[in-house]
Each structure stands twice: as C-alpha cells, then as structure tokens.
UniProtKB/Swiss-Prot annotation:
Physiological role: Mediates glycerol diffusion across the cytoplasmic membrane via a pore-type mechanism.
UniProt-recorded name of the protein: Probable glycerol uptake facilitator protein
PANTHER family for this protein: AQUAPORIN OR AQUAGLYCEROPORIN RELATED, AQUAPORIN-9
Membrane topology: Multi-pass membrane protein
GO cellular component terms attached to this protein's record: plasma membrane
Gene3D superfamilies per the UniProt record, alphabetical: Glycerol uptake facilitator protein
Keywords: Cell membrane, Membrane, Repeat, Transmembrane, Transmembrane helix, Transport
Annotated transmembrane regions: 6-26, 38-58, 88-108, 159-179, 185-205, 243-263
Disulfide linkage: none
GO MF annotation terms: glycerol channel activity
Superkingdom as given in the UniProt entry: Bacteria
Motif NPA 2, chain ranges: 214-216
Species of the source: Streptomyces coelicolor (strain ATCC BAA-471 / A3(2) / M145)
C-alpha cells in the first residue's frame, strides 16, 4: 500500500473511531443528551463498536492500525519501521478531526452543560462533590472526559501500569490474529473480534484510568479540548497527558516483542 493510502486510511479510520467513541462519551455525559447517565456499559460497548466500524472501513486502505501502539507493535513484529511516521501523522490528524466532529454534533449539549451553574459552579451553584473539586484542582475541566481519559485515583505508577497492561492485551489479540490474505487489515471477523476485545478491556481494566490504550485517542481530542472555544471548559489536565501516550506505546512494544518470542 502507498504512503498516501496509509495516510488517508488512517485519517479517515481514526476520525471515525473518535467520532463514534467520543460520541458515546458525550452522549452519556452531557446535559440535555437523551443517553445521559447510560453508564459504563454503554461506554465500553460504544468504544468496542467504534473500533469495529473504523477498522472495517479503513482496513482496505491502510490496514486499520488507528493507534500508534498498534503501529509500534506491528513494526516490531515485522521489523519494518518505514511507514511509521505516515501512520502516526494520519492517526493524530484523524483523532483531532473526530473530536471536532463530536463537538459539532453535540454543540447544543456542550453549551447547555457548560453554562449550567450546578455543573460549572458560580453564584447559586449547589455544592460540588469531593471528586469534582479534586478534578478541578488537578486541572480537569467539567467536559474533559468527553475528549480524553483521566484516572479515578492519581497514582503515576498504577496509572501507567494499567495503560501498559490494557494495551498489551489489545496488541496481543491483534497480532495473534494476523493480517488477512490480502494484507489489508483484519477483515470482517478480525474487526469483530478486536471490537469485543476492546469491550472486554473496558469492562475489566477501564476502571482505574478510563482505558486510553491508544495515544492519539487521548492526545488528539485533548488538544482539541484545549483549542475549542468552549465556555467554562476548565483545564485540559496536561500534567496527566503523558501517561495515556507513553503507557500504550510501551504496552504495544512489549506485545510486539512477546509475539516474536512466543508466537513467531
């Protein structure tokens, strides 16, 4: 596949991934959303179906990595890093585009949520929970969770380890499936399996950090959150932002090495 196919495929696929995955986060979080408070099960399945859809659509163009950790794991497995920068560029651009599309689709809900005194504070606001106060002190705005991940308990080693472990599981599941005969991605069955692996990771390992398991899934939307003209949006929590980038890259690299030792 050509560099242009890779870039276009990763941009489109990652944009779809963030549109559908970030969209479910918006749906369950924002005021005036019909799905508000649908819960963690909706988020886990929403992200799984997002991965499934994006992988199926973009697979013929780029192989549907959609995740720098996947690109790193496959590069280690194959010993070929030549297209890595192209994959990374398409993935980051796509993630940012997807986050902007979520904002467009939920524009009214964002405005309603961020101008609600009970949510953002101010005169007449009710007392916020201790968790909300702690989040604000750490620089996390009231809608940052729609865009990116954040830990329930801030513990650098634990948070990093959780992202490494979750991404390792994802990559091992992907690498052991292998590419289909045409080399154009996981195919229909592979996309389905990978989607349900993501659901499983979300349900079992998502509690501590929100399971980024993908550097651009967190970084791209976090950049968009910082840039968008959202009222009362608060901080983008840059002090935490390195963990959902570095952790998945380490997990992907370990999975690539383990695959070569145990499965190749």
């Amino acid at each position: 596949m050509s560099s242009s196919d890779i870039f276009i495929g990763e941009t489109i696929g990652t944009a779809l991934l963030i549109l559908l995955g970030g969209g479910v986060c918006a749906a369950v979080t924002l005021k005036a959303s019909k799905a508000r408070n649908a819960g963690w099960l909706a988020i886990a399945f929403g992200w799984g179906f997002a991965v499934m859809t994006a992988a199926y659509i973009s697979g013929p163009l780029s192989g549907a990595h959609l995740n720098p950790a996947v690109t790193v794991g496959i590069a280690i497995k194959d010993g070929d890093w030549s297209n890595t920068p192209t994959y990374f560029a398409g993935q980051l651009l796509g993630a940012m585009i997807g986050a902007v599309l979520v904002w467009v689709a939920y524009y009214g809900q964002f405005q309603a949520h961020l101008t609600d005194r009970e949510i953002v504070g101010g005169p007449g606001a009710q007392d916020t929970t201790a968790k909300s106060v702690e989040a604000q002190e750490k620089g996390a705005g009231p809608v940052l969770g729609v865009f990116s991940t954040g830990p329930e308990i801030r513990h650098t080693v634990q948070n990093l380890a959780t992202e490494i472990i979750g991404t390792f599981v994802l990559l091992l599941a992907i690498l052991t499936q292998g590419l289909n005969d045409e080399g154009n991605g996981l195919g229909i069955l592979g996309a389905l399996i990978t989607g349900f692996v993501v659901v499983s990771i979300g349900l079992s390992l998502g509690g501590p950090t929100g399971y980024a398991i993908n550097p651009v899934r967190d970084l791209g939307p976090r950049i968009v959150h910082a840039l968008l003209p959202l009222p009362n949006k608060g901080g983008s929590d840059w002090s935490y932002a390195w963990i959902p980038v570095v952790g998945p890259l380490i997990g992907g690299a370990i999975a690539g090495g383990v695959y070569n030792v145990a499965f190749a």
